[in-house]
């Protein structure tokens, strides 16, 4: 059979694929072989020497041996067993077995399990303590060199999966050990706290601090007591068998009190899923699983360690009702009756459009569905929106124009396998850290090409093959110029255009102004570089374009998004693996909030409210008439409050009072509302203006689904009971609706999803049963459950099945005048999320990044006499901020960068204005200028020494195992067996 090999294993002949190693074949065939250092997500590391088998009569490491036709493999011979035991002996020389009192005795310790499986009763080489102390310096995990077996999993994960490139093994020492950067304490290194190392560690050497002293019944014993206990046990032990049996009993007992629950991350749009280990209300650790569809074993600092907010003392636990200038606690019944009374009163007096509703991109799909149903079906208004209006609506608009669906056209796996990745206006490694690891890995190990266009030199820019810095707001110019160049030079995919795309002629005409000369003049990118970009894109077999708020948050954001999609059509980069458009969604469920109808002009599944047949479908199921005119965007709502047309708002899980632009203007609007309801887990800045505050539950306290940036729908399961009297948002919305007479009878979020699936064609086959565990579905989903990981393989969702080249022109950015000479770019930092309402609750994160800072260029610092820690005031026409400076070459000239992670005097939206994308009302946050005033010259750097940005990474490929093999004290176990040696020294 083509592609198959005939293999003999332990005398049995079988067929196997040639695209695997011997160990993979053995594992797939359920043939047990020790493999302490091997991890499927890491590949062969070759450090442990326990996976040795006989291949054609020669002892070899099975993890790295490529399978060949005719191979004869023996896993049972005495020589194989001897070699494996020699490898295991060396591991036990480095690792002391005290399993019963070990926090890692939870059934997953590779050393414990391998000793048991190999039936090793005694080790030939006594354990020998290493001359190193534990490194406890990091807030989230610790390293115990004395227990480290030098398998290198952590190094492999850091170097080639996460690609932070912090960890190495110093093989030159007498007793090698893992080191961080140039051998500094963990907390002073370039470690980004992603947690990969502790996730893949096969034992207790690298472990989350949340586990220490908490996991076991006999753990947490102080060292003065523990050490004598271990020594006494060693003195009386009769063999490992009995000791391991006792530890297995203790491990089984732990299952009674340690709960492991699958959830989906509540932070960015990557959609990482993982198990949360808890004891009572304590979170012991987050444990990602290989089968997690978006992230596998990967996490970032927030997803792995940023959960302290769930148990914060600042959580809201009872409803609050305003009395004058303060709040008092109230019972649910009183709060709900007040809301129903006020909503009814205002609706009757001013009409349903005097009320407006904001749903949350932090909440579940089911909760977004209910919020828009409350607005439309109970109140009778289409005034409902979500925070995609602040970030992703322009990208959605651009994709609707050109390809018909407002979501990523493929999956993260497509991005990883692309020939070239084009990143525009996205600080991917900090905004979507796990997704960025897939690009960094492909770039490092596979030679994937990366082009970055951004005004700021972030990590992905530094790693890229080509980095260009266009003038702010000019991306559409170079995009159109490159498309024009490719078409005119015969480098467009003419067959794709002819067979699958409409509008070519009009589009080509629209490109006439976009010559290379014009593009150079307007963008600042020289013609030679523009041609280089065009040639790289044109020659690539497959291209993925990624973009984010650096594109969308401009007054021409929709048009630039359209231009990106146009360029992909010109080059035929839709409908095939490794290609397509990827507008990176910012929040965990900003995609889902829009998908499930929290938009003023769209019902769930993006069906238009103006479509009579669509409305009739919903009216039949909901049993009420629906409004037919599109409602207000959240941006318009603020203006309608000021004009007196909007009287009441219900805001759920959205910090509008900080994340909307021109927040002084927003706050003034809130004060004019007749009635304001805010539903949140904390008394947010927005909630401070409310008349009623309802205590909601975060994701760990409820069931539901999120939809990530790939259109991937995933289930989350309840980890904790709601704190105090807080409730899941879906229950609160239902109770509000029922006080208004709705009569809803949902018993579980699954009931809500079932209703949505009946109404919206793109969810037709979505059920909770199909989403069980780590299963997921990428919409559109057919009724039979078949989903769509890759869109547009056969047709585009337009009547004739063809995409559309949609002509767009450049809208120049807003001018602020010469007085405001500093351009204030803004965005995210890795450690914090948005205004920091969640992440500043984490002590460890706050220690590493306690405050925001203003990045300024060395040249601007020299011109103004600024140093690290200088306190400045930035003033725009709309407000001012006070913030400390940090000098860095990540920015240049009079470009500065102010992260959005502040809710006080440095909150970026004190500076931003109300101007917005002309097509979607998305605020033009990135078009902000200010003047600078020095308030205090001398100060302490806002970036602590322990921040990873001060580190010194050490890039290398993997663990450099050849350095181990070159050591004088190393002998390959296979050679030791040949020489008749009992162990390898």
Curated annotation (Swiss-Prot):
[4Fe-4S] cluster 3 binds at residues 158, 191, 194, 197. [4Fe-4S] cluster 1 binds at residues 95, 99, 102, 109. This is Probable oxidoreductase YjgC. Gene3D superfamilies: 2.40.40.20, 3.10.20.740, 3.30.70.20, 3.40.50.740, ADC-like domains (2.20.25.90), Dimethylsulfoxide Reductase, domain 2 (3.40.228.10). Binds 1 [2Fe-2S] cluster. The keyword Transmembrane does not apply. Residues 3-79 form the 2Fe-2S ferredoxin-type domain. In the C-terminal section; belongs to the prokaryotic molybdopterin-containing oxidoreductase family. PROSITE patterns: 2FE2S_FER_2, 4FE4S_FER_1, 4FE4S_FER_2, 4FE4S_HC3, 4FE4S_MOW_BIS_MGD. One of its GO terms (molecular function) is 2 iron, 2 sulfur cluster binding. Keywords: 2Fe-2S, 4Fe-4S, Iron, Iron-sulfur, Metal-binding, Molybdenum, Oxidoreductase, Repeat. Signal peptide: none annotated. The gene is yjgC.
């Amino acid at each position: 059979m083509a592609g198959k090999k005939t293999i003999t294993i332990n005398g049995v002949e079988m067929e196997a694929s040639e695209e695997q190693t011997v160990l993979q074949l053995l594992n797939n065939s359920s043939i047990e072989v020790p493999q302490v250092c091997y991890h499927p997500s890491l590949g062969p590391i070759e450090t442990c020497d326990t996976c040795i088998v006989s291949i054609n009569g020669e002892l070899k490491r099975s993890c790295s041996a490529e399978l060949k036709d005719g191979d004869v493999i023996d896993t049972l011979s005495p020589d194989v067993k001897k070699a494996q035991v020699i490898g295991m002996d060396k591991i036990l020389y480095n690792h002391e077995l005290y399993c019963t009192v070990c926090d890692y005795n939870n059934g997953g310790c590779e050393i414990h399990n391998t000793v048991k499986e190999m039936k090793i009763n005694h080790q030939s080489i006594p354990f020998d303590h290493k001359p190193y102390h534990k490194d406890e310096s990091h807030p989230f995990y610790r390293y115990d060199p004395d227990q480290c077996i030098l398998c290198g999993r952590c190094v492999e994960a850091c170097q080639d999966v996460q690609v932070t490139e912090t960890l190495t093994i110093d093989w030159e020492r007498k007793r090698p050990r893992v080191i961080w950067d140039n051998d500094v304490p963990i907390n002073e290194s370039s470690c980004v706290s992603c947690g990969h190392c502790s996730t893949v560690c096969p034992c207790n050497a690298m472990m989350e601090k949340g586990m220490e002293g908490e996991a076991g019944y006999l753990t947490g014993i102080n060292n003065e007591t523990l050490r004598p206990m271990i020594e006494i046990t060693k003195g009386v032990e009769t063999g490992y068998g009995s000791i391991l049996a006792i530890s297995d009993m203790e491990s089984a007992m732990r299952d009674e009190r340690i709960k492991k629950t699958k959830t989906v991350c509540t932070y960015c749009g990557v959609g990482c899923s993982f198990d949360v280990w808890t004891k009572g209300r304590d979170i012991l650790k987050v444990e990602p699983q290989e089968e997690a569809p978006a992230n596998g074993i990967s996490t970032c600092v927030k997803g792995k360690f940023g959960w302290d907010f769930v148990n914060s003392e600042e959580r809201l636990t009872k409803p609050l009702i305003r009395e004058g200038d303060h709040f008092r606690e109230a019972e649910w019944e009183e709060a709900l009756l007040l809301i129903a009374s006020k909503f009814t009163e205002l609706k009757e007096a001013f009409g349903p459009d005097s009320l407006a509703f904001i749903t949350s991109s932090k909440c579940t799909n089911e909760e977004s569905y209910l919020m828009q149903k409350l607005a439309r079906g109970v109140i009778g208004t289409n005034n409902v929106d979500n925070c995609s209006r602040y970030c992703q609506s322009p990208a959605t608009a651009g994709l609707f124009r050109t390809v018909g669906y407002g979501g990523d056209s493929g999956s993260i796996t497509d991005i990883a396998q692309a020939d070239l990745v084009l990143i525009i206006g996205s600080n991917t490694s900090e905004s979507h850290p796990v997704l960025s690891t897939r690009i960094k890995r492909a770039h490092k190990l596979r030679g994937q090409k990366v082009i970055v266009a951004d005004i700021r030199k972030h990590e992905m820019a530094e790693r890229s093959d080509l980095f260009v810095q266009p003038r702010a707001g000019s991306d559409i110019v170079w995009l159109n110029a490159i498309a024009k160049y490719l078409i005119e030079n015969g480098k467009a995919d003419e067959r794709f255009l002819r067979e699958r795309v409409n509008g070519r002629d009009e589009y080509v005409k629209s490109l006439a102004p976009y010559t290379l000369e014009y593009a150079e003049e307007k963008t600042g990118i020289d013609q030679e570089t523009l041609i280089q970009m065009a040639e790289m894109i044109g020659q690539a077999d497959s291209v993925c374009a990624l973009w984010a708020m650096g594109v969308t948050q401009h007054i021409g954001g929709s048009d630039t998004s359209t231009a990106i999609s146009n360029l992909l059509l010109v080059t035929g980069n839709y409908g095939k693996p490794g290609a397509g458009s990827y507008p990176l969604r910012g929040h965990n469920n900003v995609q889902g909030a829009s998908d499930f109808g929290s938009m003023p002009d769209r019902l769930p599944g993006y069906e238009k409210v103006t479509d009579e047949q669509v409305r009739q479908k919903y009216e039949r199921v909901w049993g009420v008439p629906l409004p037919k005119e599109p409602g207000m965007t959240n941006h318009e709502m603020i203006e309608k409050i000021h004009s007196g047309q909007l009287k009441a708002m219900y805001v759920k899980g959205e910090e509008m009072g900080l994340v909307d632009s021109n927040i002084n203007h927003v706050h003034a609007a809130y004060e004019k509302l007749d009635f304001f309801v805010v539903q949140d887990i904390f008394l947010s800045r927005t909630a401070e203006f409310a008349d009623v505050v309802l205590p909601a539950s975060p994701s760990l306290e409820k069931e539901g689904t999120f939809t990530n940036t790939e259109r991937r729908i995933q289930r989350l399961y309840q980890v904790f009971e709601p704190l105090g009297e807080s409730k899941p948002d879906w229950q609160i919305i239902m109770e509000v609706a029922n006080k208004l007479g709705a009569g809803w009878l949902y018993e579980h979020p699954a009931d809500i999803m079932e209703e949505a699936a009946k109404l919206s064609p793109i969810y037709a086959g979505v059920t909770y049963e199909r989403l069980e565990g780590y299963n997921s579905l990428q919409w559109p989903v057919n009724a039979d459950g078949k989903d769509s990981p890759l869109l547009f393989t056969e047709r585009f969702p337009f009547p004739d099945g063809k995409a559309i080249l949609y002509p767009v022109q450049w809208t120049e950015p807003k001018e602020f005048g010469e007085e405001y000479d500093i351009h204030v770019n803004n965005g995210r930092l890795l450690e914090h999320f948005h205004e920091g309402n969640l992440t500043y609750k984490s002590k460890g994160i706050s220690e590493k990044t306690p405050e925001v800072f203003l990045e300024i260029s060395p040249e601007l610092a020299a011109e103004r006499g600024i140093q690290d820690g200088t306190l400045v005031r930035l003033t725009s026409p709309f407000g001012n901020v006070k913030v400390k400076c940090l000098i860095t070459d990540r920015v240049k000239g009079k470009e500065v960068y102010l992260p959005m992670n502040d809710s006080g005097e440095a909150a970026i939206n004190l500076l931003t204005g109300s101007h917005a994308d002309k097509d979607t009302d998305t605020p033009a946050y990135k078009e902000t200028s200010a003047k600078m005033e020095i308030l205090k010259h001398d100060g302490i750097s806002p970036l602590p020494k322990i921040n990873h940005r001060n580190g010194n990474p050490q890039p290398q490929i993997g663990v450099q195992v050849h350095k181990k093999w070159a050591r004088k004290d190393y002998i390959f176990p296979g050679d030791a067996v040949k020489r008749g040696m009992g162990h390898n020294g």
